[in-house]
Amino acid sequence: MINLMNMTLEELEQMLSEMGQQKFRAKQIFKWINSGIRSFSDMTNISKQLRDELEKVSKISRLKIVDRLQSKIDSTVKYLFELEDGNIIESVLMEYKHGFTACISSQAGCRMGCKFCASTGAGFSRNLTPGEMLDQVMTMQEDSGNRIGHIVLMGIGEPLDNYENVIKFLKIVNHPDGLMIGMRNISLSTCGVVPRILQLAKENIPITLSVSLHSARDDKRSAMMPVNKTYCIDKLISACKIYTVSTKRRITFEYAMILGENDSEQDARELAGLLKGMLCHVNLIPVNTVTGNGYKKSSRIHIDKFKNILESKGIETTVRRELGSDINAACGQLRKNKIDSTTNLLLNS
């Protein structure tokens, strides 16, 4: 059965045309779906006959909130959602000066295997549909009562490993009859899937691309990120340069500051050399503590020194604010804990 949450306006128009309905009905239904309704009966300007016909061939499938963690030190809220098939994902709602930002997941789990990331810990289940990505934004907006104006695809999963569904989601969430979130207010974070970066450069979608770099050296990056064994740093930087030239958009390079691993002055100088002359920005991220990987965040002194070296070499650099640190707001850990506890319960029953 078709989930209407996954459909673009054009797809709805085609579907309604095949049902013998006028084109304007599709826009009415699209608006209802994107307003957050949970039942066909909520479509008050649609005839009962059409609602009944729709209910026979389609559904409106919504997420279920399993858990909600509210930070005591800021307004950050972490959500644990259950999908229709029982899979679990995470999202985070964050408040900034410019308003509210939704950090959403693109997959149930991740197959990239980055050593410092909790998303990989519980394994990969499947890609999320466009509707499941959209619903994370809608449900957090409904639950909080706050308008979400920015989205970051930095939750569980590698967005470019779910390319077609992510592109479709972006078009739905940006639509003027939908949530109407501007493309320039959307960021997509990738571990560096080079062919997809090159494909994204041709899409004419002016989002912000963030690339998880974390080292300027192949040996160090490969040890932390298996994807580097397939797409080495030279290939990645080459693709990023093509992206900036094609889109005229600045790339953000994310750099997790890990004590004793990649936070030395030499690491900073190597990074500055790698990025010299690029249209880019570096975001230094104090690494989150993830059970089992042994990584610890760099000291503030190390981070500030690293930042100063980059800036002295002409690289624009910021340090990410640690929102929701008391609830471990980085995505993946809560899902892993939930899956582990369920597994233990089944094993001991």
Swiss-Prot record:
Keyword Coiled coil: no
Domain Radical SAM core: 96-326
Top-level class of the enzyme under EC nomenclature: transferase
Keywords linked to the UniProt accession: 4Fe-4S, Cytoplasm, Disulfide bond, Iron, Iron-sulfur, Metal-binding, Methyltransferase, rRNA processing, S-adenosyl-L-methionine, Transferase, tRNA processing
List of residues binding S-adenosyl-L-methionine: 157-158, 189, 212-214, 288
Enzymatic reactions: adenosine(2503) in 23S rRNA + 2 reduced [2Fe-2S]-[ferredoxin] + 2 S-adenosyl-L-methionine = 2-methyladenosine(2503) in 23S rRNA + 5'-deoxyadenosine + L-methionine + 2 oxidized [2Fe-2S]-[ferredoxin] + S-adenosyl-L-homocysteine; adenosine(37) in tRNA + 2 reduced [2Fe-2S]-[ferredoxin] + 2 S-adenosyl-L-methionine = 2-methyladenosine(37) in tRNA + 5'-deoxyadenosine + L-methionine + 2 oxidized [2Fe-2S]-[ferredoxin] + S-adenosyl-L-homocysteine
InterPro entries: Aldolase_TIM, Methyltransferase_A, RlmN_N, RNA_MTrfase_RlmN, rRNA_lsu_MTrfase_RlmN/Cfr, rSAM
GO BP: any one term: tRNA methylation
Disulfide bonds, paired cysteine numbers: 103-331
Cofactor: [4Fe-4S] cluster
Cofactor note as given: Binds 1 [4Fe-4S] cluster. The cluster is coordinated with 3 cysteines and an exchangeable S-adenosyl-L-methionine.
Residues holding [4Fe-4S] cluster: 110, 114, 117
Active site per database record: 90, 331
Pfam families per record: Radical_SAM, RlmN_N
Record EC number: 2.1.1.192
Subcellular location: Cytoplasm
Entry GO terms, CC: cytoplasm
Job description of the protein: Specifically methylates position 2 of adenine 2503 in 23S rRNA and position 2 of adenine 37 in tRNAs.
Note, other: Reaction proceeds by a ping-pong mechanism involving intermediate methylation of a conserved cysteine residue.
Family the UniProt entry places it in: Belongs to the radical SAM superfamily. RlmN family.
Full protein name: Probable dual-specificity RNA methyltransferase RlmN
Species of origin: Ruminiclostridium cellulolyticum (strain ATCC 35319 / DSM 5812 / JCM 6584 / H10)
